[in-house]
């Protein structure tokens, strides 16, 4: 079932906006669009006068100056005096509050349109002039009650601006939701990248450990050539260790992990050591499988040394790792090498 969130009468869907204009704005840029750009993107037709005046009336609480150009837009034509007479009569008859500012009022500086009108006036005219000021709420009453020839067009445009604000709010909410999802995905990607890097570091450390162990064992093998001849004796010549934890094991593991460069891994050591290593390896490779396990091998190191001496092209040995595409052949070789311990060739 689709989840919806309601905010100030707007229903926000998990599937995204249903309004084509909001979709267009969201698809225009990953950056947040200011209202002017939003209007351009969705193709909103702006009136050079009404857009600016009406927008400020809707979004802020600052009083507005009923400038000459605004009065003309509202439908009050003729000379300045005629305009003033008509608008004042309209305001009084409809009980709409307004105020007047004279040239010596310090609040004059708050209205750039008044300062602009004063530039084209003579000093004596400025001294006698009164400028009409109206609060946003009262100006909305003007729009609703306007009875000039432009009244219907003014109200229609005001309604369109209200619809624009609703669209912009919807766009803003979906934009913030998209930003939150992007940040969430970035965080998840960052976490996954770190986890992947950590796994790679573990695999690399494992590889280096194996290579080092391999070198140590090769040196040890060179020092114990004679001992090897004795270690390959049959089990009745090399009795089993009674304590199970101290018994030697030779184990071949299949990692079953696509991340690993080598799928097969050899472990040699006492039983308790092997069990501990397998437990930790399963945490690193959840699909780990034991494919070859010899318990009580008299000297498991020698078995792997003999395997490497075969130099079989089907197998590539890197440390304790084995690369091969033929697991069956690998098992056959180890079984044969294990059986060969019965063939004693003492010098």
From Swiss-Prot:
Keyword Coiled coil: yes
Coiled-coil boundaries: 178-226
UniProt cross-references to Pfam families, sorted A to Z: DUF3627, MSV199
Alphabetical UniProt keywords: Coiled coil
Keyword Transmembrane helix (UniProt): no
Family: Belongs to the IIV-6 006L/238R/313L/468L family.
Protein name: Putative MSV199 domain-containing protein 388R
């Amino acid at each position: 079932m689709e989840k919806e969130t309601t905010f100030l009468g707007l229903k926000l869907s998990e599937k995204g906006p249903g309004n084509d204009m909001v979709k267009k704005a969201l698809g225009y840029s990953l950056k947040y669009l200011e209202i002017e750009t939003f209007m351009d993107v969705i193709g909103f037709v702006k009136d050079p006068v009404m857009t600016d005046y009406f927008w400020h009336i809707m979004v802020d609480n600052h009083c507005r100056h009923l400038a000459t150009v605004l009065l003309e837009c509202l439908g009050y034509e003729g000379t300045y005096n005629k305009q003033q007479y008509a608008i004042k009569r309209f305001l009084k008859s409809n009980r709409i509050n307004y105020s007047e500012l004279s040239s010596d009022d310090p609040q004059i500086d708050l209205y750039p349109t008044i300062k602009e009108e004063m530039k084209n006036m003579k000093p004596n005219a400025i001294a006698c002039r009164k400028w009409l000021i109206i609060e946003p709420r009262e100006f909305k009453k003007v729009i609703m009650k306007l009875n000039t020839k432009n009244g219907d067009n003014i109200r229609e445009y005001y309604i369109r601006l209200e619809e624009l604000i609703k669209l912009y709010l919807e766009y803003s909410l979906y934009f913030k939701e998209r930003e939150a999802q992007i940040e969430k995905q970035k965080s998840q990607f960052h976490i996954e990248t770190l986890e992947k890097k950590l796994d790679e570091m573990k695999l690399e450390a494992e590889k280096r450990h194996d290579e080092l162990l391999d070198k140590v064992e090769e040196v040890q093998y060179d020092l114990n050539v004679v001992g090897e001849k004795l270690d390959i004796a049959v089990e009745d010549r090399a009795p089993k260790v009674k304590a199970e934890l101290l018994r030697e094991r030779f184990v071949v593991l299949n990692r079953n992990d696509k991340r690993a460069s080598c799928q097969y891994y050899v472990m040699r050591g006492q039983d308790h050591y092997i069990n501990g290593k397998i437990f930790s390896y399963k945490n690193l490779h959840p699909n780990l499988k034991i494919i070859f396990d010899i318990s009580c091998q008299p000297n498991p190191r020698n078995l792997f040394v003999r395997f490497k001496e075969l130099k079989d092209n089907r197998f590539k040995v890197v440390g304790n790792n084995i690369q091969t595409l033929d697991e069956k052949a690998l098992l056959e070789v180890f079984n044969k090498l294990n059986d060969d311990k019965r063939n004693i060739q003492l010098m």
